[in-house]
Amino acid sequence: MSEKDTIHLAADLSFLHTDFLWRMPGSWAGYPYYSSSEFYEEIAKTAERGRMDLLFFGDTGGTSEDFGGSHDAVVTNGVKWPRHDMTPMIPILARMTKQIGYALTMSTTYHHPFHCARVFNALDHVTKGRIAWNAVTSAYKWEAMNWGFDVMMEHGERYRRAQEFFGSCWPTMG
């Protein structure tokens, strides 16, 4: 099969822990996501055995406003929140696997290019080249507030910042 005919498969683990758990009373009791890394270790090993190419960890630094413009329902019912920073998990998973890649999300709006380059260079080394960056400009006002801003930066300004970010960050990531 040629490269042109190859399909690459990724598992999106962004919201794995809460998508529908809010519908099941008591579903948080004993849930493995918060107590240990074994849950993700098993997923990584299983995905690699299944010849998947990538585990994708989408992320945000704030809650969504998908339910009536408020984060109340999200927080009260645990819908896609809370979430852990998966950065520390990547080296653990990479040591347990040999082929599968990992994609980690980092915002160009709230992170500094030096920090981003430093993190991804380190992850590139410890994963032996199996790391990808899901660069986002962020979208939620609660994320802005969590980073110390009263309002979300305007859409155009976020994308101008992202362009500048890539210009200064990308050359250091090679």
Question: Model-derived features: where do they sit?
Answer:
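A broadly tuned preference for mixed-charge, low-complexity surface segments
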Residues: 53-67, 102-112, 156-157, 162
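Secondary-structure transition/capping motifs at alpha-helix termini
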Residues: 1, 96-100, 124-131
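Hydrophobic faces of well-ordered beta-strands that scaffold small-molecule active sites
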Residues: 7-11, 55-57, 100-106, 129-135
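Flexible, glycine-rich active-site loops centered on histidine and acidic residues
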Residues: 12-33, 108-174
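Aromatic/His-enriched, Gly/Pro-containing loop or helix-boundary segments
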Residues: 79-93, 100-113, 156
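N-terminal beta1-alpha1-beta2 module of alpha/beta enzyme domains
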Residues: 1-96
